[in-house]
């Protein structure tokens, strides 16, 4: 009752809404990745879980969208004949913030991975509250990058489980400084 009239009812109802939002976003992302995999259309989706990514964190910040997250929009953004298909899509919550984003590449596994996988590793090495879904254009293989490590190959149902787990562990309200941790010094050679 103390919260009535304070504008703070989100404390009471916010977590249910956030859980529904997370569940909805996980479903959309898993379905879109699964469909991209089936048709062997490459994709790269960055999930900001509180890193507060800024345009200067990318080689090219892409085109700002601020659009509702949906399977159809993700499939269209990664269509081969569209100008944004080669870059990453940046997602936060249930919003697609931007598309055509060019990510910094990892220096690990240069001979083992393609550009999409190196980009996924690169962004997740630098920001610990960030995940990256990768769909290989060549094989249709799904991968998930987290903290500079790739889990692959995975199924779309495994992806859904991993995303649900990561969202459950993500802090509900991240502070600006908490998520910004740079974990790789690009001047040092990686073994």
Label for each model-derived stretch:
Residues 1-191:
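Divalent-cation
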């Amino acid at each position: 009752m103390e919260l009535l009239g304070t504008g703070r009812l989100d404390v009471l109802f916010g977590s249910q809404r956030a859980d529904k939002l997370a569940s909805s976003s996980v479903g959309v992302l898993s379905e879109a990745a699964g469909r991209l995999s089936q048709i062997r259309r490459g994709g790269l989706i960055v999930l900001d879980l509180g890193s507060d990514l800024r345009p200067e964190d990318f080689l090219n910040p892409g085109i700002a969208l601020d659009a509702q997250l949906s399977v159809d929009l993700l499939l269209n953004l990664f269509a081969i004949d569209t100008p944004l298909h080669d870059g990453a899509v940046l997602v936060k919550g249930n919003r697609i913030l931007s598309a055509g984003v060019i990510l910094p590449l990892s220096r690990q596994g240069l001979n083992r991975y393609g550009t999409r996988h190196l980009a996924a590793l690169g962004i997740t090495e630098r920001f610990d509250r960030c995940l990256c879904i990768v769909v290989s254009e060549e094989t249709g293989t799904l991968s998930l990058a987290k903290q500079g490590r790739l889990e692959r190959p995975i199924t779309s149902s495994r992806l859904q489980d991993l995303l649900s787990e990561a969202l459950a562990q993500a802090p509900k309200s991240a502070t600006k400084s908490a998520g910004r941790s740079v974990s790789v010094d690009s001047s040092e050679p990686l073994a």
